[in-house]
Swiss-Prot record:
UniProt binding sites for Ca(2+) 1: 124, 126, 128, 130, 135
GO cellular component: a single term: nucleus
Role this protein plays: Functions as an integral cofactor in cell pH regulation by controlling plasma membrane-type Na(+)/H(+) exchange activity. Binds to and activates SLC9A1/NHE1 in a serum-independent manner, thus increasing pH and protecting cells from serum deprivation-induced death. Also plays a role in the regulation of cell proliferation and tumor growth by increasing the phosphatase activity of PPP3CA in a calcium-dependent manner. Activator of the calcineurin/NFAT signaling pathway. Involved in the cytoplasmic translocation of the transcription factor NFATC3 to the nucleus.
Phosphoserine carried by residues: 27
Name of the protein in question: Calcineurin B homologous protein 2
Organism name: Rattus norvegicus (Rat)
Keywords: Calcium, Cell membrane, Cytoplasm, Lipoprotein, Membrane, Metal-binding, Myristate, Nucleus, Phosphoprotein, Protein transport, Repeat, Transport
Length: 196
């Protein structure tokens, strides 16, 4: 097995990744070590199979969809920069960063709106900008498994879509999705404290 150093300078494009993700150098170093540990064959990239070894994703009902987010546009590999970018959505929001942020700069990946966009994409499988009843049903089925009957699940799905669908088109747009989650503390629910 090759040498695995603990120096942040060994991370390719570390400064750009730090700017894009908002992770500190210490957090990036921890993530890089995790990336290397998952890359058991030292290929320099991760495959879906590598990510399926993460226990928290293996037991998460949306684990496969979260793993899919690491591989946009049908790619089969994720390099460290892409790995860090996806995990940045789960970085806790630092209120100091929010007040000091330059409004001319793009919103950080871990902002409330970007966390909501990430969550929305877990539902919007066909990427048409709307969550159809069928897409909602698929996600709810993953989340509840066999704990409810198909009839109950159909009813829950219909009620969920109906409550969020303000324009009556039978689907949930991103704005409707965001509005339906206004009162939810998405910042806390989509945060991994160990990465701070």
């Amino acid at each position: 097995m090759g040498s695995r150093s603990s120096h942040v300078a060994l991370i390719p494009d570390v400064d750009q990744i730090r700017r894009e993700t908002g992770f500190s150098q210490a957090s990036l170093l921890r993530l890089y070590h995790r990336f290397q540990a998952l890359d058991r064959e030292e290929k320099g990239f991760l495959s879906r199979l590598d990510l399926q070894q993460i226990g928290a994703l293996a037991v998460n009902p949306l684990g496969d969809r979260i793993i899919d987010s690491f591989f946009p546009n049908g790619s089969q590999r994720v390099y460290f920069a892409g790995f860090a970018r996806v995990l940045a959505y789960f970085r806790p929001i630092d209120e100091d960063d929010a007040t000091l942020r330059d409004p001319k700069q793009p919103e950080p990946l871990n902002s409330r709106m970007n966390k909501l966009r990430f969550a929305f994409q877990l539902y919007d499988l066909d990427r048409d900008g709307k969550i159809s009843r069928n897409e909602m049903l698929q996600v709810l089925r993953l989340m509840v498994g066999v704990q409810v009957t198909d009839e109950q699940l159909e009813s829950i799905t219909d009620r969920t879509v109906q409550e969020a669908d303000e324009d009556g088109d039978g689907a949930v747009s991103f704005l409707e999705f965001a509005k339906s989650l206004e009162k939810m503390n998405i910042e806390q629910k989509m945060s991994i404290r160990i990465l701070k």
